[in-house]
Amino acid sequence: LYDPTAGKILFEGKDISGKMSKDTQKLLRNDMQMIFQDPMASLNPRKKVEDIIGEGLDIHHKFANAAERDQMVKAILKKVGLAPEHATRYPHQFSGGQRQRVGIARALIMNPKLIIADECISALDVSIQAQVVNLMKDIQEETGTAYLFIAHDLSMVKYISDRIGVLHLGHLLETGTTEEIFNHPVHPYTRSLLSAIPSPNPVVEKKRVAETYDYKTSGIDYTKGTKHLVEGSHYVRCTDAEFSEWMKKAPLVYD
């Protein structure tokens, strides 16, 4: 859909950012799946759930007969917390959380190595968000599937992620393990995001000071920065002068 202006996208050691061979496309469509932001908009309203989930099986011929296909669909429904009889229903007959479970089932049935979850909980109620994220964690522990979890809710990002990358205006500003980013955020944009998270502890919440960040007035130029090592696997993109200044800042009080 878009031609990259710079950089490469590597998956399993193969460059998938440009034109791909048919074999690479087939491999990619088997090994990489997507969970979309809006569960209602991403499900065909005219198809039953069994056909929505089974579409990938049909395209890639992953079953021997109709009975095996039916069994695979019902097994994946059970894995995501839905009943086998839900297979014959249409998307409008489900709640938002249930529809997102259908979307997760559609991705999982292909046994992918990577699932890209694009703001997959932002359209759901808070209580339902927790259910969906817990489901995704359980599935990951069971199957070993990797997630690229795209979100703006950093409390959920902290809960589900092993590593975090902070993006702004198309630039990767800071990367590290969840502990490294949350314990020692360096970039002003990262600090502003983390300082905005309310604390459930009233004592900590009273001390919390939300930092503001405006790229236009910050004097920071993302194109001039280079990768600087903070510690371990924690890196920040900045100039030498910015790195020296930011490393002197006091730790945040946000948790």
Description of each model-found segment:
Residues 3, 16-33, 59, 181-185:
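ABC ATPase NBD coupling module
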Residues 15, 67-85, 194:
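Conserved ABC ATPase "signature" region
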Residues 104, 116, 132:
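Hydrophobic anchor residue at the start of the ABC signature
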Residues 178-246, 250-251:
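Short catalytic/signature loops enriched in Gly
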